[in-house]
Amino acid sequence: MRFSFSDEQLALRDATRDLLTKECTPAHLRDAWTNETGRVPGLWAQLDDMGILGMLAPESAGGLGLTFVDLVLVLEETGRFAVPEPVVETAAWGVPLLGRTDLTIAASEHWVPWADSADVIFTAAGRFERAGAELVARPSVDGARRLFEVQGTPSPVDGGEAIAAYDRGVCGIAAQQCGLADRMLDMTADYVRERRQFGVTVGSFQAVKHHLANARIALEFARPLVYRAAASIATRDPDTGVHVSMAKAKADAAAQQSARAALQCHGAIGYTTEYDLHLYLKRSWALARSWGNAKFHHDRVARAIL
């Protein structure tokens, strides 16, 4: 049995990274923090042109007919670049649920990011059509992830379908957390190789090495759980919910450890908004409290075990 990703899956990941390297730079993110939409102009269309948004839709509906294992690496890349678009909400949650690729989906339990640009909105209360919903802007620590409280009368969603969609969304967020952790550690490693103190690079100090090594270990323990959760979704494993919650809890912890290590090793400059680190730190903080926090997912795993 093969447990590694195929060449085609890795090629799609690399193509996504190439696109985002050019089209979702820190400069693009800074613009998204201050522009009217909170998004990168033109990026959504490019992701759609690549087929990313419809990867899980059947070919008969205009999708690629792929599985969540194919999608998870792409979602990890969208985390690495802190993409300010509802990719998880559309590609992982909404498209498989609705069987359509022509809609932009926003989803969350309560306050919903990017609800103002969606066609259909899902919350814990049910499904809202954008035209019939009232949106109330709410504060967000991440200026490119604008939140809205959705008010109106929702339509019910089938319980089984809602749970499956939720698990896909949670796994997608966990994958993004892995990408964010990787990005913050890479930025920090580059910084400590160049920053000099007492005549040497700060990366030569043992304490700095330990911070980054421990954070890297946490990330490498989280990744396999995310990939297993993706495989469970793809194969409809009866323990999918447990695997997804394990992945989210571990990925959140890894991202938060990477964030702490990044701040500690950067020092004062890491706290400034002029430096790019905060763009990724704040996204990881926001995602850790989205789609169920650590306590929720630990409890979900515990209930399945006990």
Where on the chain are the PLM-derived regions?
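Alpha-helical interface subdomain recognition
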Residues: 1-81, 165-306
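FAD-binding core of flavoproteins
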Residues: 81-186, 190, 200
